[in-house]
From Swiss-Prot:
A biological process from GO: translation
UniProt key word Ribosomal protein: yes
Species, as recorded: Chloroflexus aurantiacus (strain ATCC 29366 / DSM 635 / J-10-fl)
Gene3D superfamilies found in the cross-reference section: Ribosomal protein L33 (2.20.28.120)
Protein name as it appears in the record: Large ribosomal subunit protein bL33
Amino acid sequence: MASKKGNRIVIKLKSTESGHTYTTEKNRRNDPSRLELRKYDPIVRRHVLYRETK
């Protein structure tokens, strides 16, 4: 079988206030820079900024 090399890669989003992480996918072509999203952090129990890590 041929392997499929797509534009989607799996990334980790790490909280700026605690050690909590989310995993998600992003499209390399549409978002070449690092993602920053506001998501819910269950450790501090509020929405905080999450940044993409390697």
